[in-house]
Swiss-Prot record:
Gene Ontology, cellular component aspect: cytoplasm
Subcellular location: Cytoplasm
Main location: cytoplasm
PANTHER family given in the database record: TRNA (CYTIDINE(34)-2'-O)-METHYLTRANSFERASE (PTHR42971:SF1)
Residues bound to S-adenosyl-L-methionine: 83, 109, 130, 138
UniProt lineage: Bacteria, Bacillati, Mycoplasmatota, Mycoplasmoidales, Mycoplasmoidaceae
Top class in the EC scheme: transferase
Protein name (database record): Putative tRNA (cytidine(34)-2'-O)-methyltransferase
Organism: Mycoplasma genitalium (strain ATCC 33530 / DSM 19775 / NCTC 10195 / G37)
Amino acid sequence: MYKSVINIVLFCPEIPNNTGNIVRSCTAFKANLHLIKPYGFFLNDKRMVRAGLNCWDKIQLFEHKSWEHFLQATTENKTIWLLTKSGDKTPDQICMTNKLPNELYFVFGQETKGLPKTIMDNFKQNQIRIPIWNSVRSINLANAVVCILYEYSKQNQYSNLDKQCA
């Protein structure tokens, strides 16, 4: 297992295949994964298990009963960023270096609804967006997570990754 300062948070994920793919991506980039209930599937859903491949014994996975439980259960030294279409900043405009004293948490909303307004209102200054062409409503959740994981790795000179392929 690994200890990471980067945390991916899925708020009430709905699609098991997306979550399984995110398990695999978080493992590949050595990121912790937090799932906030309720889910739109069971954790043993065969589509999720298949999408996660052989990463289930390697992932740092945390489950939370609610948003409030997530906030209480995580470290006090944290910076929370919400991913949203209306964010003022893009991932390259925020500091993600692992030299920060805080753990980084990147929160992604539900595939169909995004994040609730109450959460968005509490983190107005910490909203980022992944730039895409305006004619497209959104990108797939699993792909959005990889965009953030890659930017984190890039800002840290890929120090969280192996430099050579297996």
